[in-house]
Design a protein with these regions (language model features):
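Conserved ABC ATPase signature
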Residues: 57-61
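Catalytic Walker B motif of ABC-type/P-loop ATPase nucleotide-binding domains
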Residues: 82-86
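H-loop/switch region of ABC-family ATPase nucleotide-binding domains
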Residues: 117-118
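Helix N-cap at the start of a conserved alpha-helix in ABC-type nucleotide-binding domains
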Residues: 93-94
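Conserved ABC ATPase "signature" region
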Residues: 27, 38-53
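Hydrophobic anchor residue at the start of the ABC signature
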Residues: 71
């Protein structure tokens, strides 16, 4: 892995520019690196299930749609390291399944994924190692066999 690695980050409550569409928000982020073209943006919007809402203003997005856009922003540059804070927060059943599949795809691509999640079943499904942290201290660590 290169250092510093290409990193994608999803914070628990992602925020974007309200008067811009989902597509425009991603295009603005993409302009920072200059390595992401419109086809890549459209592809990532398809992966997270926002193709039909790409031109809709962000302020009109539901909480789940905002979360999906945050996931799209985190993965659109094909990071080596992906840090996800509660990636399934505010998602419906389809959104949770889609997000789990995206995380699997990223891991299969060789991405190191670090995530927080309160849903133990999701962690057990997706993670090789699980750490329970209480008051800043690792209480239990478990590994998939």
């Amino acid at each position: 892995m290169d250092f510093p690695p290409k990193m994608g980050v999803l914070i628990e409550n992602p925020a974007f520019l309200g008067n811009y569409s989902g597509y425009e928000n991603l295009r603005l982020l993409a302009s920072i690196s200059g390595k992401i073209n419109s086809d890549m943006i459209e592809d990532v919007l398809e992966r997270v299930g926002l193709s039909d809402s790409a031109k809709k203003k962000y302020r009109k997005y539901s909480l789940g749609m905002k979360q999906r856009l945050g996931i799209a922003a985190a993965i659109m540059e094909k990071p080596n390291l992906l840090i996800l804070d509660e990636p399934t927060n505010a998602l419906d059943t389809d959104g949770v399944q889609r997000t789990k599949e995206i995380i699997r795809e990223e891991r299969n691509r060789g991405t190191l994924v670090i995530m927080t999640c309160h849903d133990r079943a999701i962690l057990e499904d997706l993670c090789d190692e699980i750490f329970n942290i209480e008051h800043g201290t690792v209480m239990i660590a478990s590994t998939k066999d």
